[in-house]
UniProtKB/Swiss-Prot annotation:
Principal location class: secreted
Keywords, sorted A to Z: Adaptive immunity, Blood coagulation, Coiled coil, Disulfide bond, Hemostasis, Immunity, Innate immunity, Secreted
Organism, as annotated: Meles meles
Cellular compartments annotated: Secreted
Domain remark from Swiss-Prot or TrEMBL: A long coiled coil structure formed by 3 polypeptide chains connects the central nodule to the C-terminal domains (distal nodules). The long C-terminal ends of the alpha chains fold back, contributing a fourth strand to the coiled coil structure.
Secreted recorded as keyword: yes
Protein name: Fibrinogen alpha chain
Self-association state and partner proteins as the record states: Heterohexamer; disulfide linked. Contains 2 sets of 3 non-identical chains (alpha, beta and gamma). The 2 heterotrimers are in head to head conformation with the N-termini in a small central domain.
Role noted for this protein: Cleaved by the protease thrombin to yield monomers which, together with fibrinogen beta (FGB) and fibrinogen gamma (FGG), polymerize to form an insoluble fibrin matrix. Fibrin has a major function in hemostasis as one of the primary components of blood clots. In addition, functions during the early stages of wound repair to stabilize the lesion and guide cell migration during re-epithelialization. Was originally thought to be essential for platelet aggregation, based on in vitro studies using anticoagulated blood.
Length: 16
C-alpha cells in the first residue's frame, strides 16, 4: 500500500 495508491483508492471510492 503506497501513498499514491492510497490516495487513488480513496479518491476513487469517494469520487465515483
Amino acid at each position: 500500500t503506497d501513498v499514491k495508491e492510497s490516495e487513488f483508492i480513496a479518491e476513487g471510492a469517494v469520487g465515483r
